[in-house]
């Protein structure tokens, strides 16, 4: 059974006298920096000159270049996109680390897949809120918090666990509960969830349903409503009450269809495909492909993205969403995973 830590389980003074540098000031960086500051932690921000730099200054932080921040800090939290971390680490962070520092991440990708190899004389740990930055910030302001994960990769000081928990507490995570994991488990389950269910699996299911209806002669507008628009209603119920609560809230007809038709769509073959996806994550195949794709400036990524954006479901959806002013738009880049823009 997973171990969960709350505020009362965590030492108060572990971060006292420690200067924490937040590297990156996107969705997560913004939330971490403000929450830490309001928890009494000595915080600075390291970011490249530009919009994020100015925004961090406007929020009242001491702002430096990444290299300058890294040179001052005792604790460095790297909150940059996965694909940017290695370059920034190699060029601006690595040579600034001193023995006894803490190198912290919110996702284990680069450490687990050996893109970043920390020196042997620093603590390395992970603190990962299970929610987007704006939610981490909003719940903190409300006196609550978002559950978080923590993991220890390297404990030189003998206090890495205490430091990780203290950090999680300072951003509000221990108000909701902090769960212990490993870099391997966090990285592999996070990637699998994104690929097989939350992003890849879901978008493919939605498109397949839409195409099935339109190819059978149904109007694309109705197909959009049935296969995409109404998804939020169901997901919200699942989010709040689980599968049981969702099924309680829908009609008996819908529930019966769930029971008898769902397993026909997501059958044993789909599960075998999921296992293959997991294997590619575990053995590093996916990571290698993504790293190489970025090294050659993303030709496949960009081509697929452009093609997907012109799928009929997108063309129809843009028009229908204009009819619904209650649907919030314009937040395409709000970070919903742990990585944040710098």
UniProtKB/Swiss-Prot annotation:
EC number assigned by the record: 1.1.1.86
Catalytic activity: (2R)-2,3-dihydroxy-3-methylbutanoate + NADP(+) = (2S)-2-acetolactate + NADPH + H(+); (2R,3R)-2,3-dihydroxy-3-methylpentanoate + NADP(+) = (S)-2-ethyl-2-hydroxy-3-oxobutanoate + NADPH + H(+)
Keyword Transmembrane helix found: no
EC class name: oxidoreductase
GO biological process: isoleucine biosynthetic process; L-valine biosynthetic process
Stored PROSITE patterns: KARI_C, KARI_N
SUPFAM superfamilies in UniProt: 6-phosphogluconate dehydrogenase C-terminal domain-like, NAD(P)-binding Rossmann-fold domains
Co-factor binding comment: Binds 2 magnesium ions per subunit.
Protein name stated in the entry: Ketol-acid reductoisomerase (NADP(+))
Gene: ilvC
